[in-house]
Curated annotation (Swiss-Prot):
Signal peptide: none
Classification of source organism: Bacteria, Pseudomonadati, Thermodesulfobacteriota, Desulfovibrionia, Desulfovibrionales
Protein name per its UniProtKB record: ATP synthase subunit delta
Topology in membrane: Peripheral membrane protein
Organism: Nitratidesulfovibrio vulgaris (strain DSM 19637 / Miyazaki F) (Desulfovibrio vulgaris)
PROSITE patterns cross-referenced by the UniProt entry: ATPASE_DELTA (PS00389)
Length: 183
């Protein structure tokens, strides 16, 4: 819980700094953070280094500097990462990137969601479903599509903290419960 609060504060601070320069800078900062967070996710040993209290802040600075050089991130993100190293918060980088993405989506008016189906949808059908959902939501929608044969048929749509379960499995479960109750 505390890590999330800390990550949110740092993400808001970086977002406010980028907002002064415009949406283009916000996008650049977001992509730089995503690259670094992706590197941390791909190499769990880096996360262990950043969480280890025995390793000094100077050593962590050296590690993050090498990572920053490798990915060629902006000076703002470089300085931000050095600040995180000095404050002992490099272990929060992935959480910071995730919340920064939420802030960026809110700024752009984008909502993210996941559409789960029992079978793979053709690209034309995906575009059609996405367009219909965008029209209904009145906002731009970034959808990820996944396949889960366990739902048997229909769709499960997750957007934010809302879930619309229109799957055959859910409908059969409701029918089963109704039969048990005698309805």
């Amino acid at each position: 819980m505390t890590g999330n609060i800390v990550a949110r504060r740092y993400a808001r601070a970086l977002f406010a700094l980028g907002a002064k320069s415009g949406v283009g800078e916000l996008d650049k900062l977001g992509s730089d953070l995503a690259a670094l967070a992706g590197a941390l996710d791909a190499a769990p040993e880096l996360g262990r280094i950043f969480r280890n209290p025995i390793i000094t802040a100077g050593e962590k600075r050296n590690v993050i500097l090498k990572l920053v050089e490798k990915y060629g991130v902006s000076a703002t993100v470089r300085n931000f990462c050095l600040l995180l190293a000095d404050k002992g918060r490099l272990d929060c980088l992935s959480d910071i990137q995730a919340f920064y993405g939420v802030l960026l989506d809110a700024e752009k008016g984008v909502i993210r969601g996941e559409l789960m189906t029992a079978v793979e949808l053709a690209e034309a059908k995906r575009a059609q479903v996405k367009a219909a959902l965008e029209q209904q939501a009145g906002r731009k929608l970034e959808l990820t599509f996944s396949v889960n044969k366990d739902i048997l048929g229909g769709v499960v749509l997750k957007v934010g903290d809302r879930v619309l379960d229109a799957s055959l499995r859910a409908q059969l479960g409701i029918l089963k419960d109704n039969i048990k109750r005698g309805e």
